[in-house]
Amino acid sequence: MLKIGVVLFTFLVLFPLATLQLDADQPVERYAENKQDLNPNERMKMIMSALGQRRCCISPACHEECYCCQ
């Protein structure tokens, strides 16, 4: 009787829990695919802001997102 209980517990409780963990990865993969659709300028802007770096701008066009490179 104990063996049947262990087998039932394994297949009815543990096996479904193990398969549910695989489903949790799907939203992350979808999000990564959406990021690839950005144009290169938007991607560069996101990367630079994440790294805390600013680009160099020519003197009349200097603003908060870049510094003047002369």
From Swiss-Prot:
<dbReference type="Pfam" id="PF02950">
    <property type="entry name" value="Conotoxin"/>
</dbReference>
<feature type="signal peptide">
    <location>
        <begin position="1"/>
        <end position="24"/>
    </location>
</feature>
<feature type="propeptide">
    <location>
        <begin position="25"/>
        <end position="53"/>
    </location>
</feature>
<protein>
    <recommendedName>
        <fullName>Conotoxin Lt3.2</fullName>
    </recommendedName>
</protein>
<feature type="disulfide bond">
    <location>
        <begin position="57"/>
        <end position="66"/>
    </location>
</feature>
<dbReference type="GO" id="GO:0008200">
    <property type="term" value="F:ion channel inhibitor activity"/>
</dbReference>
<comment type="similarity">
    <text>Belongs to the conotoxin M superfamily.</text>
</comment>
<keyword id="KW-0165">Cleavage on pair of basic residues</keyword>
<keyword id="KW-0800">Toxin</keyword>
<feature type="disulfide bond">
    <location>
        <begin position="56"/>
        <end position="68"/>
    </location>
</feature>
<keyword id="KW-0964">Secreted</keyword>
<dbReference type="GO" id="GO:0005576">
    <property type="term" value="C:extracellular region"/>
</dbReference>
<keyword id="KW-0732">Signal</keyword>
<dbReference type="InterPro" id="IPR004214">
    <property type="entry name" value="Conotoxin"/>
</dbReference>
<keyword id="KW-1015">Disulfide bond</keyword>
<dbReference type="GO" id="GO:0090729">
    <property type="term" value="F:toxin activity"/>
</dbReference>
<feature type="disulfide bond">
    <location>
        <begin position="62"/>
        <end position="69"/>
    </location>
</feature>
